[in-house]
Swiss-Prot record:
Keyword match Secreted: yes
Organism expressing this protein natively: Loxosceles arizonica (Arizona brown spider)
Function per UniProt: Dermonecrotic toxins cleave the phosphodiester linkage between the phosphate and headgroup of certain phospholipids (sphingolipid and lysolipid substrates), forming an alcohol (often choline) and a cyclic phosphate. This toxin acts on sphingomyelin (SM) and on ceramide phosphoethanolamine (CPE) with high activity. It also acts on lysophosphatidylcholine (LPC) and on lysophosphatidylethanolamine (LPE) with moderate activity. It is not active on lysophosphatidylserine (LPS), and lysophosphatidylglycerol (LPG).
Binding site for Mg(2+): 42, 44, 102
Descriptive protein name: Dermonecrotic toxin LarSicTox-betaID1
Cofactor note: Binds 1 Mg(2+) ion per subunit.
Distribution of this protein across tissues and organs: Expressed by the venom gland.
Active site per database record: 22, 58
Enzyme Commission number: 4.6.1.-
Stated family: Belongs to the arthropod phospholipase D family. Class II subfamily.
Disulfide-bonded cysteines: 62-68, 64-207
Signal peptide (from-to): 1-2
Lineage of source species: Eukaryota, Metazoa, Ecdysozoa, Arthropoda, Chelicerata
Length: 289
């Protein structure tokens, strides 16, 4: 499926880049970062002791220079995002094309991960997609902190199927953010029959420098038809690191300063080779120059 497709049908302007605003957990932050040029947002879903999604909250510690405790309820978040991503809605923002849910599953017992996935799918069906009544169109990336919680993904997909909404499977992909072994991640995904719509990240908090060795390894895997179709880096705030990330061939980055990435993409070195992704760019296709 997506992993096998050639993303070369849109070569105008070069590789599409997902400019993902970091830790966007209340309405004010959402509006602020969209105004700064983000085309995607990354938001933190925290869970209660039963593994049910409760609120958008990162918690302490978080990236340097950011407030860690901004929050809103999960259902209020989904409802607001539905409005922002529905053409014709008064609040519609055409540039918001992808929502990455950073699922804080390390606090959830492993045996609850499957039911957590079902619960998140159910709430998205009811509040974001409104069981087919909503025109909300964003692509969704389920970002899992460790491959040890991969059953969350199965639960999510199984719930879409059992509720009769397999069509939303086309809108949903997965990502694993734990900097785990890439080969092992690929093997586990294959064993779970998760074979498409896969992103792979590498990174660390903006407070700490990280070498790009693993990022480049992931990009090499992507380009040799590995399990992932997109590779992104986090959290990237410095202009110099943004440039290095683009030169390495990444498909996007999480940043606290999306306006800086917009500026870098307009620099002479990058403006012909990269561009901000739009809704017409399929996030589940591997880009071929």
């Amino acid at each position: 499926e997506g992993a096998e497709q050639d993303g070369s049908e849109r070569t105008d302007g070069g590789r599409p880049i997902w400019n993902i605003a970091h830790m966007v957990n209340n309405k004010q932050a959402i509006d602020k970062y969209l105004d700064k040029g983000a085309n995607s947002v990354e938001s933190d879903v925290s869970f209660d002791s039963d593994g049910k999604p409760e609120k958008m909250l990162h918690g302490i510690p978080c990236d340097c220079g950011r407030k860690c405790l901004n929050q809103m309820s999960f259902t209020d978040y989904l409802d607001y995002m539905r409005q922002l991503t529905t053409p014709g809605d008064p609040k519609f923002r055409e540039n918001l094309i992808l929502i990455m849910l950073d699922l804080k599953l390390k606090s959830v017992a492993a045996n609850l991960a499957y039911s957590s996935g079902q619960e998140v799918a159910l709430q998205m069906l009811n509040t974001y997609w409104k069981r087919g009544e909503s025109g909300a169109r964003a692509y969704i990336v389920l970002s899992i902190p460790t491959i040890k919680r991969v059953t969350f993904v199965r639960g999510f997909y199984d719930k879409l199927h059992s509720e009769g909404f397999d069509q939303y499977r086309e809108k949903v992909g997965v990502d694993f953010s734990g900097n785990e072994d890439l080969d092992e991640t690929g093997r586990i995904l294959s064993s779970q029959n998760i074979l498409d719509h896969i992103w792979q990240s590498d990174g660390i908090t903006n407070c700490i420098f990280r070498v790009m060795t693993r990022l480049k390894k992931a990009i090499n895997k992507r380009d040799s038809n590995g399990y992932m179709v997109k590779v992104y880096y986090w959290s990237v705030d410095k202009y110099t690191i943004m440039r290095k990330t683009l030169r390495a061939g990444a498909d996007g980055m999480i940043t606290n300063f999306p306006d800086r990435l917009v500026s870098v993409l307009n620099e002479r070195e990058f403006s012909g080779k990269f561009r901000l992704a739009t809704y017409d760019d399929n996030p589940w296709e591997r880009y071929k120059a």
